[in-house]
């Protein structure tokens, strides 16, 4: 590889026709396409980082950034094949994550893309005629679904995902608005368009299921789940005075019908032509962007509207208008705002809105400014600087300043600073500029326009022409290295002029074709030229003759350059080679490898060479040139490179192309270091200013100074007046506040005394309550101690009883063990005899089982044969159905043939219409020729107008002198006016004081009336409060009486409950006592309330039940209807199945019976089951009495244990009920008493049962 390295440093340009051409990476960094790169631009720090396109790419078509701002998808055409490259933006530098370029479906290019909300899926739309929508799992390069969106070759403009749902997709285009859902591996359309189709240009999701769509007729629609919910139309009114007003003219809530549609999407030129003929034109909505409050949309040329959501409805209303400002540097300022907004993007915090336009410009606006300017529309600002909007035709640089000069077919000249990466100066003209050259000093330029060659001064804020030459369509011009000469090409002739006398000193003739490139040698003694005639000439300027020539008619040269020693000429052209020419001979030809070289430049050191290609790449080579393919190739532009230059110090490479972009590159040698050339003098900072401009500015400064002095005096006087007024107001306020403070102090003192009284009262009350509580506690402790002593004595007695019962139970257990051992011996003898009998029976049963298994196999075979016959019948039935379906398909094919014939006839009609259109186009071309001839006449008239303008300027100078005299008289008038104003100001303070005093008197009278009203209101409030106080006193007395009654009731209940506790060991008496308590204390009214509540619940229950029964009845009817529809098909099959199931059930019963017999026999063998008492009595009645005695005793013990357990559970339940009653009534006196254990009583109960 070559040792010469070029690194992208900065780019000036934008490719606005890439779909989705601007994004925010974060709050400071935006991403946009420029050349064949994507640029990450930091708005605050002004740096750029680059994501280059793919190798051999023919340019980017569409971009998409993932919602998590981690991935960037780029659609390109690489070697005439479509490809999608996905970059990871978080890595530094950005690296390729995936490349999607192997497709098993037809595709020409991808025109729109979108990432899913979780960034895992990618949606891509192909161009017509395929118009396929592809749904990718891009990490695995897997196509999840593909569907054809349109079959009529209508363009599709945009695809997108729902912001919350990976499976929901929206597609808009000419005559189509489709919502699709990904399910079961396919994309299915979920909504179908109603009404007449519109040309939908753009859309955005404003909610999970709501979409705003814009059309080419200025209409906005809101769709919710595919149904139209809202519609509005935007109209641009263009009155004759040039002002425009933007009005919403129609708003409806139509849900069914769409409004009528006009013509399909026109081009930008057609739209401008149409608007010039009519006073009313419909704006086209090219871009829509959603944000938290609503959405922003483009509304015709140079305008953006903000819509906000209405609070009470799900509709939107226009809230703000933002315009592209008029450009004062433009030749026609009215045209500067007539550019369509193609893309809109909000920053992540929604503080900034960025827009890109059809003229390759980037604008931004801070959203807070739109809120400030409520009355009038807000205006955009340039995000960076104005950019070229057409191919760059000329490129130049100088020695004394870091300037780059460019000219373009957009009729503008721009000067850039490659050190600060800013735009220094620009100006637009009426004619297109084809070539430009910058003087080495940086103070002059020469520009070749369509009509003339102009020599211009570069002033501090303007570019002014001071000499014109009648050279039409000058394609190349160049200052000499010394700056004393410049050359300009006029067709096939080179004119050489001197910059001192500005005269033509030589005309170099010899080319037979158009000259494409000229270059000076180092000492300006020679000029080298190359042209389309295949000739490269070296001219001697002192003689004006050719010194060397090299002619190759098969090659059309695009660019030539010369080595620093002027011995070798390098030329590139249409024959795909780079030629070294010396002494009229071609020394070497180096292949360009399937591309055409369009530009070439060699460094001043002679060690590096750079060439530009027709595909937009640059190649860096070392010199002398190698024979092999040894160079570094870099992706640069999206079109052929038109111009290339190296700065004088060989530090920077400059490239310009037909895509309207300008790149600056940093150049390095083989060690990676910049190629440094020592500069003896730094860059110049001087600028040119005309004398008249300086005088005007000085005059303006003097006027402003006098105005500043006058304003100072005026402000000082106003300040003094304000100080006096404010000092008086402060004094009044201080007096007022002092009085208020004193009144508040007295109030505070009164409140303190009241607080102290209340504190004393509360303290005494608390002490009384504490004494009362302590006395009650002592009483309760005495009662509890006595109860505890009684319970402890009971507990001792019960413990003695439990010991005696435990000894008796141990004796019974020993007796039971002895009887158990005897019973076991008797049972073993009995079961051994029984076992012998069962073995014989088991052998017999096994033989029976074998016989039954054989019978089962035979029945199984019969069932299988019956099933096979049934399957065969079903097969014949469905084959018959298949034949019927095939016949219906053949019938439908015949119908499709008829439809195809109709389609072919319609196609012929379409072809006839296209022929008519072609004839009309021919007539249009003729008319355009007439228009061009008329335009030439107009240019001649313009020249006459210009000459008359010069005479007018002379007259205007005289008028200017008279205006100066008028200004002097105006100044004298101004002094007199000032004196009059001062006298008026002396009178004004007295009048102001009188007016202020009158206002104060009126305010005091109003305050007095307010005080009277407040007094009357307060008196009424006091009477109301006294009445309320009396009512509350009476109510308090009633409540206290109720409280005393309840306390008495609670005491009576406690005593009765205490009496009940004495019967806690006797359940029957306890039950009677509790019933008595219930009858005594529970009133019937309570029961009635409970019953009423139960009846309400019952009514609610029955109402709900009736509602459910009605629903169930309707559902049953539906089920019955559906069952009747399908019942006839299944009746026969069900009858056959029933017969088969019956046979299978009978076989299962027999099998179950045999299995149970086998299981019983096996259990008998293994002694797993016990013999029932009845069976034992039948087999051996003699041993019945011996076996039943111990078992009966065991059953009695189990029963007594069960009874004890049940009684224990009942006691526990009663205890829980007592605790709940204590918690409800607040009876806590027995809370600390621990009752004795009931184990002894339970033991007594067990003894009694035994």
From Swiss-Prot:
Keywords: Cell projection, Coiled coil, Cytoplasm, Cytoskeleton, Disease variant, Repeat, WD repeat. Pfam families: Beta-prop_EML_2. Its main location: cytoplasm. SMART domains: WD40. Belongs to the CFAP57 family. This is Cilia- and flagella-associated protein 57. It is linked to Spermatogenic failure 95: An autosomal recessive, male infertility disorder characterized by markedly reduced progressive sperm motility and multiple morphologic abnormalities of the flagella, including irregularly shaped, short, absent, coiled, and bent flagella. One of its GO terms (cellular component) is cytoskeleton. SUPFAM superfamilies: Quinoprotein alcohol dehydrogenase-like, TolB, C-terminal domain. May form homodimers. Associates with components of the nexin-dynein regulatory complex (N-DRC) and the CFAP184:CFAP263 complex. One of its GO terms (biological process) is axonemal dynein complex assembly. Induction: May be an IRF6-target. It is found in: Cytoplasm, Cytoskeleton, Cilium axoneme.
């Amino acid at each position: 590889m070559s040792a010469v390295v070029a690194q992208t440093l900065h780019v000036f340009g934008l490719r606005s026709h890439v779909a989705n051409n601007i994004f925010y990476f974060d709050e400071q960094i935006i991403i946009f396409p420029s050349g064949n790169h994507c640029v990450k631009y930091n708005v605050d720090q002004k740096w750029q980082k680059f994501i280059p396109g793919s190798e051999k790419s023919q340019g980017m078509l569409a971009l998409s950034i993932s919602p998590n701002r981690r991935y960037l998808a780029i659609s390109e055409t690489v070697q005439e094949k479509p490809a999608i490259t996905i970059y990871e933006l978080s890595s530094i530098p950005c690296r390729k994550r995936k490349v999607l370029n192997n497709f098993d479906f037809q595709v020409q290019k991808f025109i729109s893309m979108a990432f899913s909300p979780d960034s895992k899926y990618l949606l891509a739309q192909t161009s017509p005629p395929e118009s396929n929508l592809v749904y990718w799992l891009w990490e695995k390069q897997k196509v999840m679904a593909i569907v054809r969106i349109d079959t009529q070759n209508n363009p599709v403009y945009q695809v997108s995902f729902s912001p919350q749902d990976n499976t929901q997709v929206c597609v808009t285009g000419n005559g189509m608005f489709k919502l699709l859902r990904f399910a079961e591996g396919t994309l299915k359309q979920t909504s179908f368009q109603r009404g007449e189709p519109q040309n939908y240009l753009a859309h955005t999701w404003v909610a999970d299921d709501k979409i705003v769509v814009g059309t080419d007729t200025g209409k906005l629609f809101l769709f919710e789940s595919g149904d139209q919910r809202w519609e509005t139309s935007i109209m641009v009114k263009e009155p004759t005075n040039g002002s425009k007003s933007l009005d919403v003219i129609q708003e409806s809530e139509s849900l069914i019908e769409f409004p009528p549609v006009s013509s399909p999407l026109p081009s930008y030129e057609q739209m401008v032509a149409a608007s010039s003929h009519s006073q009313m034109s419909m704006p086209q909505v090219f871009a829509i962007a959603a944000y938290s409050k609503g959405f922003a949309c483009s509304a015709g040329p140079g305008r953006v509207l903000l819509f906000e959501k209405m609070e009470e409805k799900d509709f939107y209303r226009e809230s703000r208008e933002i315009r592209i400002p008029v450009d004062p540097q433009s030749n026609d300022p009215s045209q500067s705002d007539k550019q369509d907004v193609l893309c809109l993007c909000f920053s992540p915090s929604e503080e900034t809105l960025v827009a890109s336009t059809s003229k390759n410009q980037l604008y931004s606006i801070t959203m807070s400014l739109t809120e400030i300017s409520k009355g009038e529309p807000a205006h955009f600002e340039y995000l960076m600087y104005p950019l070229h909007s057409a191919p760059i035709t000329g490129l130049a640089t100088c020695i004394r300043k870091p300037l780059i000069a460019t000219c373009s077919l957009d009729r503008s000249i721009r000067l850039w600073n490659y050190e600060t990466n800013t735009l220094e100066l620009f100006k637009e003209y009426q004619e297109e500029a084809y070539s430009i050259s910058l003087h080495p000093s940086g103070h002059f330029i020469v520009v070749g326009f369509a009509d003339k060659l102009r020599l211009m001064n570069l002033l501090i804020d303007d570019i002014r022409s001071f000499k014109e030459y009648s050279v039409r369509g000058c394609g190349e011009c160049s200052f000499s290295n010394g700056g004393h000469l410049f050359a300009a090409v006029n067709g096939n002739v080179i004119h050489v002029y001197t910059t001192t006398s500005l005269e033509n000193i030589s005309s170099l003739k010899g080319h037979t074709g158009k000259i494409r490139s000229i270059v000076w040698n180092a000492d300006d003694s020679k000029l080298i030229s190359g042209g389309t005639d295949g000739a490269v000439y070296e001219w001697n300027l002192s003689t004006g003759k050719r010194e060397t020539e090299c002619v190759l008619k098969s090659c059309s040269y695009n660019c030539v350059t010369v080595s620093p020693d002027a011995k070798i000429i390098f030329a590139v052209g249409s024959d795909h080679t780079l030629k070294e020419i010396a002494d009229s001979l071609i020394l070497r030809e180096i292949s360009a490898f399937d591309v055409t070289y369009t530009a070439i430049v060699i460094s001043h050191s002679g060690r590096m060479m750079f060439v530009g290609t027709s595909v937009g790449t640059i190649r860096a080579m070392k010199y002398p040139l190698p024979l092999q393919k040894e160079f570094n190739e870099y992706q640069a532009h999206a079109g052929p490179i038109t111009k290339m230059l190296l700065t004088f110090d060989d530090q920077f490479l400059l490239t310009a192309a037909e895509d309207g972009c300008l790149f600056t590159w940093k150049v390095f040698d083989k060690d990676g270091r910049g190629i440094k050339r020592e500069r003896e003098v730094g860059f110049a900072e001087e600028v040119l200013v005309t004398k008249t401009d300086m005088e005007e500015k000085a005059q303006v400064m003097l006027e402003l100074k006098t105005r500043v002095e006058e304003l100072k005096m005026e402000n000082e006087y106003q300040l003094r007046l304000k100080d006096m007024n404010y000092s008086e107001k402060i004094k009044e306020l201080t007096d007022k506040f002092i009085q208020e403070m004193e009144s508040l102090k007295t109030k505070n003192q009164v409140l303190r005394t009241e607080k102290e009284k209340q504190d004393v009262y509360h303290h005494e009350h608390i002490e009384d309550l504490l004494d009362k509580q302590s006395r009650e506690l002592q009483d309760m402790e005495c009662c509890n101690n006595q109860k505890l002593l009684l319970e402890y004595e009971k507990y001792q007695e019960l413990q003695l009883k439990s010991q005696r019962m435990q000894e008796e139970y141990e004796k019974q257990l020993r007796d039971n063990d002895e009887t158990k051992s005897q019973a076991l011996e008797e049972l073993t003898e009995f079961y051994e005899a029984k076992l012998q009998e069962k073995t014989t029976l088991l052998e017999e049963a096994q033989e029976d089982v074998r016989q039954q298994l054989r019978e089962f196999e035979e029945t199984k075979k019969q069932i299988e044969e019956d099933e096979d016959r049934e399957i065969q019948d079903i097969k014949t039935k469905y084959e018959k159905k298949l034949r019927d379906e095939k016949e219906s398909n053949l019938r439908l094919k015949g119908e499709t043939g008829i439809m195809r014939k109709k389609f072919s006839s319609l196609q012929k009609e379409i072809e006839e219409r296209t022929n008519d259109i072609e004839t009309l186009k021919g007539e249009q071309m003729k008319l355009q020729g007439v228009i061009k001839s008329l335009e030439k006449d107009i240019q001649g008239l313009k020249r006459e107008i210009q000459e008359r303008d010069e005479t007018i300027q002379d007259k205007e100078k005289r008028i200017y002198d008279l205006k100066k005299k008028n200004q002097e008289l105006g100044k004298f008038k101004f002094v007199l006016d000032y004196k009059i104003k001062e006298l008026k100001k002396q009178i004004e303070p007295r009048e102001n004081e009188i007016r202020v005093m009158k206002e104060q008197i009126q305010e005091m009278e109003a305050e007095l009336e307010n005080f009277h009203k407040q007094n009357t209101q307060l008196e009424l409030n006091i009477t109301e409060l006294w009445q309320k106080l009396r009512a509350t006193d009476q109510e308090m007395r009633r409540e206290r009486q109720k409280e005393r009654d309840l306390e008495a009731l609670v005491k009576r209940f406690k005593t009765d409950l205490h009496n009940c506790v004495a019967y806690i060991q006797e359940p029957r008496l306890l039950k009677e006592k509790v019933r008595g308590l219930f009858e005594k204390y529970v009133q019937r009214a309570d029961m009635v309330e409970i019953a009423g509540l139960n009846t309400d619940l019952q009514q609610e229950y029955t109402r709900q039940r009736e509602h459910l029964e009605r629903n169930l009845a309707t559902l049953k009817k539906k089920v019955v209807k559906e069952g009747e529809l399908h019942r006839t098909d299944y009746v026969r099959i069900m009858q056959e199945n029933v017969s088969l199931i019956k046979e299978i059930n009978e076989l299962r019963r027999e099998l179950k019976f045999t299995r149970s017999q086998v299981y019983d026999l096996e259990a008998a063998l293994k002694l797993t089951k016990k013999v029932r008492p009845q069976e034992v009595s039948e087999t051996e009645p003699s041993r019945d009495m011996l076996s039943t005695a111990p078992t009966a005793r065991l059953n009695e013990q189990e029963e007594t244990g069960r009874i004890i357990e049940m009684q224990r559970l009942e006691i526990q339940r009663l205890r829980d009920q007592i605790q709940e009653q204590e918690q409800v009534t607040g009876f806590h006196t027995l809370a600390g008493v621990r009752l004795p254990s009931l184990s002894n009583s339970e033991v007594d109960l067990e003894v009694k049962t035994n």
